[in-house]
């Protein structure tokens, strides 16, 4: 079951295929809303599922290619993954980049369809970051670090405590053309481990900005920095590092 080019599936059909193979749900970033079918609709769904099984649940073309069970595992309970939601205000996508020791996949949900592509081992963070638009304004602005309480105080009083808060306010006030919320995830015998705070990415008229949130005593620290796609991938890898710590 090898997809060097994206192959499309109805989200509900892929969810049924994965659950039937693994006993687990499709990954949360891809999973469609549960539906109840009458007997006729259920018969049609069962027929589509049987057709998918007939097409994909058989001998692989090469001993190096994954079987249906291998692909289904990465689509439901991957050992390593990063994923997220993307929006430009009109189009909303969600994506999962997942990998094992010998292959990986990228699955992108667009409405009721999910497109799946497989690949030999690659850096998952790079694969997911590549979902972001390639065409974006580049900024040379210096990174800025503030506390969430400082921003709330400035919003309440109209007075910024320092230049860092003023710069952060300017960045945050710029309407996003594209926004993304990205997570890192690992799974082991003790279950699924997701980063506590997502990496947020905003494409604006003044540049692409990455927002990292972390704990600072009983506060939230906000790190805002100009970012390229490569930088977003590096920051995603950092989410994994914090899970391992």
Model features per residue range: what roles?
Residues 1-245:
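Short, surface-exposed polybasic-aromatic patches that bind anionic ligands, especially phosphate groups
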């Amino acid at each position: 079951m090898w997809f060097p080019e994206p192959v499309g599936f109805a989200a509900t059909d892929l969810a049924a295929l994965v659950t039937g193979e693994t006993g687990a749900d499709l990954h949360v970033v891809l999973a469609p809303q549960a539906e109840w079918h009458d007997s006729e609709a259920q018969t049609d769904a069962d027929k589509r599922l049987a057709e998918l099984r007939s097409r994909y649940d058989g001998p692989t073309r090469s001993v190096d290619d994954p079987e249906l069970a291998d692909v289904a595992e990465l689509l439901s309970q991957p050992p390593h993954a990063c994923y997220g939601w993307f929006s430009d205000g009109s189009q909303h996508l969600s994506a999962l980049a997942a990998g094992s020791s010998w292959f990986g996949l990228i699955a992108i949900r667009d409405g009721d369809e999910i497109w799946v592509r497989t690949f030999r081992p690659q850096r998952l963070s790079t694969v997911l970051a590549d979902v972001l638009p390639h065409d974006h304004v580049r900024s040379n602005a210096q990174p800025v670090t503030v506390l969430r309480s400082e921003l709330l105080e400035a919003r309440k009083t109209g007075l910024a405590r320092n230049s860092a808060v003023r710069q952060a306010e300017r960045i945050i006030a710029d309407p996003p053309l594209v926004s993304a919320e990205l997570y890192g995830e690992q799974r082991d015998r003790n279950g699924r481990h997701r980063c506590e705070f997502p990496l947020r990415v905003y494409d604006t008229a003044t540049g692409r900005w990455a927002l990292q949130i972390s704990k600072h005593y009983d506060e939230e620290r906000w790190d805002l920095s100009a970012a390229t796609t490569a930088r977003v991938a590096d920051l995603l890898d950092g989410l994994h590092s914090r899970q391992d710590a």
